Each structure stands twice: as C-alpha cells, then as structure tokens.
C-alpha cells in the first residue's frame, strides 16, 4: 500500500503508486516533440567595431618599461606624489590602529576598581 500526505486533513492517506511517487500533483513531463528552434534563420553579424577598437590603447608595454627602470626608487613610489601620499596615509593608519589595539588590550586586561 502507498501513502501520501494530505494537505487537507494534514494526515497520511492511502494513495495509488503514481500519486505517492509524484507528490502534490507534480507529474513527470513526457514530451515527444522537440522544442521549436528560436533562431531558425541565420543571424547576421554586425560589422561594427570589434572589442579591441573601443577598449582603448594598450598601455601595458609602456608601464612595464616605466616600472622596470632601475632608478633606485621603490616600486610602490614610482608614480610620485600620489603614491607617496597613499603610502604615508596607509602607514599612519596602520601604526595608529596598532597602537589603538594595544591600548584596548591593556585596558581590557586591567580589573575595574569598585
């Protein structure tokens, strides 16, 4: 005997094998026909600009030459003032955050006076 959960009575009820194996009215789809082809006619490709045309100029070779020059300047400071400001800001925030964490750990380790 096969059982199926009845949504109406909220109990198990006797059912046929096909109902028990396909719950809630879901039936396996048996289709003998293939779905219609969406693009049955050949599509015409556009003769517009290719991906390379609107991607812009390839600047990688110039940047490689610029960053590989041996002029004694570290790689993270090669572009001048903006790189220096970014580096100094990052280092200041890192040192400040480290000091803040150490102070917070020190304060958390001390017992409170009552």
Curated annotation (Swiss-Prot):
UniProt-listed InterPro entries: COX7a (IPR039297), Cyt_c_oxidase_su7a-rel_mt (IPR017267), Cyt_c_oxidase_su7a_sf (IPR036539), Cytc_oxidase_su7a_met (IPR003177)
Keywords: Acetylation, Membrane, Mitochondrion, Mitochondrion inner membrane, Transit peptide, Transmembrane, Transmembrane helix
Source organism superkingdom: Eukaryota
Pfam families linked: COX7a (PF02238)
UniProt GO molecular function: protein-macromolecule adaptor activity
GO biological process terms held by the UniProt record: mitochondrial electron transport, cytochrome c to oxygen; mitochondrial respirasome assembly; regulation of oxidative phosphorylation
Transit peptide segment: 1-55
Transmembrane segments: 82-107
Intracellular or extracellular location(s): Mitochondrion inner membrane
Modified sites of kind N6-acetyllysine: 69
Bilayer disposition of the protein: Single-pass membrane protein
Gene Ontology CC annotations of this record: mitochondrial inner membrane; mitochondrion; respiratory chain complex; respiratory chain complex IV
Self-association state and partner proteins as the record states: Interacts with the mitochondrial respiratory complexes III (CIII) and IV (CIV), promoting their association.
Function: Assembly factor that mediates the formation of some mitochondrial respiratory supercomplexes (respirasomes), thereby promoting oxidative phosphorylation and energy metabolism. Acts as a molecular adapter that associates with both mitochondrial respiratory complexes III (CIII) and IV (CIV), promoting their association. Mediates the formation of various mitochondrial respiratory supercomplexes, such as MCIII(2)IV(2), composed of two CIII and two CIV, and the CS-respirasome (MCI(1)III(2)IV(2)), composed of one CI, two CIII and two CIV.
Family, per entry: Belongs to the cytochrome c oxidase VIIa family.
Identification of the protein by name: Cytochrome c oxidase subunit 7A2-like, mitochondrial
